[in-house]
């Protein structure tokens, strides 16, 4: 299926385990407060080929996962996977995060948002924070991370009603690649006029390279 649809560039088994499965779950397991949550609503923004959402659904069977992507063929592929793997606690949603945040059925609905993307962290925060409820979490999966990025992100996160709870820097187990996990917490409601995202501001998703 992956060769047919070209959903991920990672084809070697060990690379797949490290850069998809390990990466997906590390962001959750390294934060005990999140890992201990039960029966929560989770959204994977820009899921692509289903990461980190699919491994999350398998590892946390009492979580309800929404897999969001704007590409129909990716959603169709994931729908097939959900059926084949008999994963019943995940569903797909075809759409864009910038429009979903204006939908009252999704805004302030989720306990946890996950996002692995190459867009600027500020854009990722604008997509994710309006979707989580008070006291909810956002996990930004990043590669390299600089102190200046933290300083630039802080006021934007605050405007959206969040705060940077912590940042964890880790190494992958086999190739020693650097990963940074930015944990945001929703501490007050996002005002109705936010996020101020233009239609042309499109988040382009990819998996870690």
Predicted regions and their residues:
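Conserved AdoMet
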Residues: 1-32
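Short loop/edge segments at beta-strand edges and connector loops
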Residues: 11, 94-96, 166-168
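Conserved SAM/SAH cofactor-binding pocket of Class I
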Residues: 25-117, 125
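Helix-to-beta-strand junctions that scaffold the AdoMet/dcAdoMet cofactor pocket
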Residues: 60, 132-134
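Short alpha-helix immediately C-terminal to the canonical SAM-binding loop
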Residues: 74-76, 146, 150
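Short "lid" loop at the C-terminus of a central beta-strand within the Rossmann-like core
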Residues: 98, 143-147, 172
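Conserved beta-strand signature within the Rossmann-like core of class I S-adenosyl-L-methionine
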Residues: 135-145
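SAM/dcSAM-binding transferase cores
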Residues: 151-209
């Amino acid at each position: 299926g992956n060769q047919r649809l070209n959903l991920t560039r990672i084809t070697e088994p060990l690379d797949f385990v490290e850069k998809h499965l390990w990466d997906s779950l590390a962001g959750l397991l390294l934060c005990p407060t999140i890992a201990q949550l039960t029966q929560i609503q989770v959204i994977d923004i820009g899921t692509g080929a289903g990461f980190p959402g699919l491994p999350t659904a398998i590892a946390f069977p009492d979580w309800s996962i929404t897999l969001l992507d704007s590409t129909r063929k990716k959603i169709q592929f994931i729908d097939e996977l959900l059926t084949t793997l008999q994963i019943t606690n995940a569903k797909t949603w075809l759409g864009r995060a910038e429009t979903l945040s204006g939908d009252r059925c999704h805004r302030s609905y989720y306990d946890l948002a996950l996002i692995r993307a190459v867009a600027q962290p500020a854009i990722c925060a604008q997509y994710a924070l309006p979707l989580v409820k008070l006291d909810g979490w956002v996990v930004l999966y990043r590669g390299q991370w600089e102190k200046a990025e933290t300083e630039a992100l802080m006021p934007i996160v605050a405007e959206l009603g969040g705060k940077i709870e912590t940042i964890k820097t880790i190494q992958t187990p086999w190739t020693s690649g650097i990963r940074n996990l930015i944990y945001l917490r929703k501490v007050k409601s996002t005002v109705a006029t936010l996020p101020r995202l233009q239609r042309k501001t499109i988040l382009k998703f990819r998996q870690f390279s």
